[in-house]
Structures are given as structure tokens and as C-alpha cells.
């Protein structure tokens, strides 16, 4: 994009957090003065660095952060709730919109199974074709309704 071959983006959607494990460091990531001071080995630091880099390079671009979905596994869902809180804090600090796929996409832990096919997840974690369509329609609606 920077070399002019592609146009500057109007919208950028981050889908991040599903596999992150280093969830500490939110205050540190948000208090760093510059991106060079951010510890990118933490989820919060990596999210801040990635989002802020897009915002600095493309100030007219509207940025959205897509939160991880519910799964068929209780322990994974607990981790996703923690990850989602980190992403919410970083997103709020950078004033970018959160797309709450965890709580609003239509994929619910009550209809999914751990390690086997459920309503929309083929293995309890990853969406099947119908799940992908469901999430895609939800995200498209959120972008359309909130793009200004």
C-alpha cells in the first residue's frame, strides 16, 4: 500500500486474540509513550502496536477489532473472555470499534460441543461453512452500520 500500487484502505478489521496466552501487561502497553517502547510479546502490546501502526499510516482508515467467538469448550471460553477484556481495553484506548463476535455473532457455547461438530463449529473451535457465513454477515452488518 505504501508504494502506491494499492489504494489506502477505507476499513481494516483485526481478528486477533484466539490463541494468545500472555494476557498481562495491559497497563504497561497503554502507558508506553511510543510504539518503540511497547512490549509486543504481550497480547496487549502486540494489539496496540498493530492497531496504532494502521492508524498512524492510514489516518482516514476506519479500524474495527473482532473479538474471538464462543466455543464448545468451557475452559477456552473463559480464556476468550479474558482475551476479549484485553482487546476491549486496548481498543478503547485507541478509540477503535469492537465487533463483539463473542456475545453477538449467533455462535453460542450452548449449541457447540468440545472437540466435535456442533451447530456452527466443525470441531468445537473453528467455524464450518455455515458458521463462517454467519460471522461474515454479522461483521459486514456491524461495519455497514458503524462506518462513518
Regions found by a protein language model. Name each.
Residues 1-148:
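Alpha-helical cap/lid subdomain in secreted, periplasmic
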Amino acid at each position: 500500500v505504501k508504494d502506491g500500487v494499492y489504494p489506502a484502505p477505507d476499513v481494516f478489521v483485526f481478528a486477533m486474540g484466539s490463541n494468545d496466552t500472555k494476557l498481562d501487561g495491559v497497563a504497561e502497553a497503554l502507558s508506553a509513550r511510543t510504539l518503540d517502547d511497547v512490549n509486543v510479546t504481550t497480547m496487549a502490546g502486540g494489539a496496540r502496536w498493530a492497531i496504532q501502526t494502521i492508524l498512524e499510516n492510514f489516518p482516514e482508515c476506519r479500524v474495527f477489532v473482532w473479538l474471538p467467538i464462543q466455543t464448545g469448550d468451557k475452559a477456552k471460553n473463559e480464556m476468550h473472555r479474558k482475551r476479549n477484556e484485553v482487546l476491549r481495553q486496548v481498543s478503547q484506548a485507541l478509540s477503535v470499534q469492537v465487533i463483539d463476535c463473542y456475545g453477538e455473532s449467533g455462535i453460542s457455547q450452548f449449541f457447540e460441543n468440545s472437540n466435535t461438530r456442533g451447530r456452527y463449529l466443525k470441531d468445537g473451535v473453528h467455524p464450518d461453512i455455515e458458521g463462517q457465513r454467519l460471522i461474515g454477515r454479522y461483521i459486514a452488518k456491524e461495519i455497514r452500520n458503524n462506518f462513518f
